[in-house]
Amino acid sequence: MNFKLFLELFDNPLPIQWQIKSGGHWAGSFKINRKEYDIDFDHHDGVTDVSFTLMKPKSLSSHGITGTGDEIPVFATVANAVGEYVEKVYPRIIKFLAKEPSRVRLYRAMLDRYVKPKGYRYTLEDTMFGQEFVAIASSPLAKR
């Protein structure tokens, strides 16, 4: 995939129905082809953990690659939500986990497009659960 096409992945996000937008805690959902995805920004002590999940029947869910064929609109929607969150909340630290190595490139692109321009620097750390991105605000004044 060429780089221009790669960046266009971000251009068509779906609308998110936000159930909670309270301070640093945001929770919402969006649907693609009758499948529901949840997105959550869990904020504690200046650190925000980001997760998104394909909801399955009987409350089973999947945080990994789901094989639904919807990865492009899912990623575009999540990436734009991260951009909106950083713009409005500007947490000191934002973290998320790439459980599959194939997702690392996508997450780097998301950070470079939506988080780095807001004054964050990021690292990638190996954990027992996957690779964790940790983006740290350079300074409180770097927000805009």
What is the predicted function of each stretch?
Residues 1-144:
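Non-catalytic substrate-recognition and accessory regions of acyl/acetyltransferase enzymes
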